[in-house]
């Protein structure tokens, strides 16, 4: 079973990925892990990627695609894999199709965990931090026991990181929505696309994920 897992930040993709791996025993192939392994092992492509990352530049598609292909050629992917964080662009999706054909493999299903934008903003923009000790809270999922008082140090001053502010979160989501739309359309055209409502209990969402995997 060869899967691609998609979903916007805050949709619970990481949690579902863990459950898929635990249940089906297939390798979790995430872009971050692939880059780290390629750089640690000092492969030619890993060193090339490192040269861009060290300069704070985006790694070009041909380098990323090469690292992905090297990983998908490893024997542990022969019985299936879960791709997470790739493809990020339509060009990468097309390149993935080509490399899988060369490896005599194919994608069986693309699962998109869909959560409404306002819910994602609520989830992502709810984090705040104690200015005194750095303890992290979330207004919905992990508020202080006493409102306005830090559980750890008793401080009363809190702040939000720039990344967690609603406007920043909104902009980040807009960029993600725009870049993922052509990829979703590409896989829909191939009849591989499955969209799941992610605004439910984790196990309920996974029950739907499992159904899709078992039917493929």
Swiss-Prot record:
It comes from the Bacteria. Pathway: Purine metabolism; AMP biosynthesis via salvage pathway; AMP from ADP: step 1/1. Its main location: cytoplasm. One of its GO terms (molecular function) is ATP binding. Residues 126-164 are annotated as: LID. InterPro entries: Adenyl_kin_sub, Adenylat/UMP-CMP_kin, Adenylat_kinase_CS, Adenylate_kinase_lid-dom, P-loop_NTPase. PROSITE patterns: ADENYLATE_KINASE. AMP binds at residues 31, 36, 57-59, 85-88, 92, 161, 172. It is found in: Cytoplasm. Residues 30-59 are annotated as: NMP. It holds the Pfam family ADK_lid. Zn(2+) binds at residues 130, 133, 150, 153. Its EC number is 2.7.4.3. CDD domains: ADK. It catalyses: AMP + ATP = 2 ADP. Keywords: ATP-binding, Cytoplasm, Kinase, Metal-binding, Nucleotide biosynthesis, Nucleotide-binding, Transferase, Zinc. GO terms for cellular component: cytoplasm. ATP binds at residues 10-15, 127, 136-137, 200. One of its GO terms (biological process) is AMP salvage. PANTHER family: NUCLEOTIDE KINASE. Consists of three domains, a large central CORE domain and two small peripheral domains, NMPbind and LID, which undergo movements during catalysis. The LID domain closes over the site of phosphoryl transfer upon ATP binding. Assembling and dissambling the active center during each catalytic cycle provides an effective means to prevent ATP hydrolysis. Some bacteria have evolved a zinc-coordinating structure that stabilizes the LID domain. Monomer. Belongs to the adenylate kinase family. Catalyzes the reversible transfer of the terminal phosphate group between ATP and AMP. Plays an important role in cellular energy homeostasis and in adenine nucleotide metabolism. This is Adenylate kinase. The gene is adk.
């Amino acid at each position: 079973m060869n899967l691609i897992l998609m979903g916007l930040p805050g949709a619970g993709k990481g949690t579902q990925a863990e459950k898929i791996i635990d249940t089906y025993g297939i390798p979790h192939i995430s872009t971050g892990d692939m880059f780290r392994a390629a750089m640690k092992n000092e492969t030619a492509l890993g060193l090339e990627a490192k040269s861009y990352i060290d300069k704070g530049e985006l790694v070009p598609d041909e380098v990323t695609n090469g690292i992905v292909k090297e990983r998908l050629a490893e024997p542990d992917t022969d019985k299936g894999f879960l791709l997470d964080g790739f493809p990020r662009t339509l060009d990468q999706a097309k390149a993935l199709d080509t490399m899988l054909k060369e490896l005599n493999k194919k994608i069986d299903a693309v699962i998109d965990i869909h959560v409404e934008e306002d819910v994602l903003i609520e989830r992502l923009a709810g984090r705040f931090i104690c200015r005194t000790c750095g303890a992290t809270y979330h207004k919905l999922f992990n508020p202080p026991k006493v409102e306005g008082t830090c559980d750890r140090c008793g401080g009363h001053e809190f702040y939000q990181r720039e990344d967690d502010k609603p406007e920043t979160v909104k902009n980040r989501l807009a960029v993600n929505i725009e870049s993922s739309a052509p990829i979703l359309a590409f896989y829909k055209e191939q009849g591989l696309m499955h969209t799941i409502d992610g605004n439910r209990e984790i196990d309920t969402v996974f029950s739907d994920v499992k159904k899709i995997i078992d039917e493929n």
